[in-house]
A protein has these predicted regions:
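Eukaryotic chromatin- and chromosome-associated nuclear factors
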Residues: 1-123
Length: 123
């Protein structure tokens, strides 16, 4: 079986904590290895500004970049991803506000933050 990703392709790589996906980070494919591994270079940095190192990942932790959602209305309890710090973080909508804003609760940290709907996408 061929790897469905090719050199130079833009992808998203899952960030795992305790074997659970907490975020998807943008990267591009540097090289394919064997039948199911990729060398990836992240397009985001650590919070201190240092670059994330290239990494070999299994394709089961990779997905194509999702298209930007437009004009989506969210409801309470919708499972979504919120864009912050260069990556897409998993969570749920806990409140909907006027002016296209929602309160987003991070699945990983449990913190609630008010977010513009432009920075949210369905999961």
């Amino acid at each position: 079986m061929a790897v469905p990703y090719t050199k130079g392709m833009t992808i998203e790589v899952s960030k795992l904590v305790d074997n659970s996906v907490v975020a998807w980070l943008p990267a591009f494919v540097v090289k394919t290895f064997w039948k199911s591994n990729l060398l990836v270079d992240y397009t985001v940095s650590n919070s201190d500004g240092t670059a994330l190192p290239e990494e070999i990942v299994d394709v089961k932790h990779v997905r194509p970049c999702l298209p930007q959602a437009s004009a989506i209305s969210f409801c309470i309890n919708d499972e979504v991803e919120a864009f912050q710090g260069g990556g897409w973080w998993l969570g749920v909508i806990t409140d909907v506000h006027p002016e296209l804003k929602c309160t987003f609760k991070s699945a990983h940290l449990g913190v609630e933050v008010q977010w513009s709907q432009k920075l949210l996408r369905p999961r």
